[in-house]
Amino acid sequence: GSSGLIPMGRT
């Protein structure tokens, strides 16, 4: 997952 408002891969 990436850091940010929407951690893609951790949805």
UniProtKB/Swiss-Prot annotation:
Its main location: secreted. GO terms for biological process: neuropeptide signaling pathway. It is found in: Secreted. The keyword Secreted applies. GO terms for cellular component: extracellular region. Pfam families: Periviscerokin. Keywords: Amidation, Neuropeptide, Secreted. The modification Threonine amide is found at residue 11. It comes from the Eukaryota. Expressed in abdominal perisympathetic organs and abdominal ganglia. Mediates visceral muscle contractile activity (myotropic activity). Belongs to the periviscerokinin family. This is Periviscerokinin-1. It comes from Panchlora viridis. The lineage of its organism: Eukaryota, Metazoa, Ecdysozoa, Arthropoda, Hexapoda.
